[in-house]
Amino acid sequence: MTLLVWEGKRPADDASAARYFTDLYDRYIDTEEPAVPPVEPIAACVAALLERWPDLTEDEGDSSPWSTGPLIGEAGGPLVYFPMRWSMAEEASAYAAEVAASMGLNCFDPQARKLRP
C-alpha cells in the first residue's frame, strides 16, 4: 500500500487529486533528472512519522510500517510517497493522514483513488 502527501492547494475532488498526484510523481519521483530535496513541510511530515515508527533502515524489532528506507528518500520537492507494509498499512495510513492534515498538507490514497480527510 502507498500513501501520497504533498504541499499545495487542495484539489477540488478525487479525480483532480489523482491527476495532480500523477503530475507531481512524474516530475519529482519517477524521473531521470537530479533529485530535488523535499520542501520543509514535507521533511517535517516525514520527521513526525519517524518519531512514531523507526525508519526501515533502523528497524531492529520489525516495528516499522514502511516498506522502503530511508523514508525521506521517497520525498522530492513538494511530494512524499509512503510505501507501507500491508500488515500495518491501516494504522500507519490513518496516522500519516492525520499528521499531514495537521500540517496543512494534502493526502491521497492511490489504491482507493481518494483524498484522505
Residue ranges: model-predicted function:
Residues 1-117:
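Acidic (Asp/Glu-rich) sequence patches and key acidic residues
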